[in-house]
Amino acid sequence: MTMSDPIADMLTRIRNALMAGHTSVRAPSSKIKVAIAKILKEEGFVEDYYVTRERPQPQLVVRLKYVGERKERHPVITGLKRVSKPGCRVYTRVSQIPWVRSGVGIAILTTPKGVLTGQQARRLGVGGEVLCQVW
């Protein structure tokens, strides 16, 4: 059976792993998922990511980031929200790119210039499809 929304599946796997206190999470790999993981690493939300060369489907492994000591540690990511869904796509102009939690979080967009954060898209003057929000 095929998956109807692979990006939402990846975000849900990350959310569930954070709630369970896991150090890493695995998901089937794709170019857009790797681009999202790259942005999460650049913005400091995850420690690292890499792609395994398993057959038949390569796996994206994301190492999650926590703050604090062992018993008092809290995840850096406090929330993930899928915005544009297969049944209801959400596109935005550069002037209407959303601010997430008053600038604390990020919006991730897919644009003609690639997968970008909301801030990068504003700087480049491009709009696009709002994939998700992370805070």
Where are these regions (language model features)?
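Core subunits and conserved enzymes of cellular information-processing
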Residues: 1-135
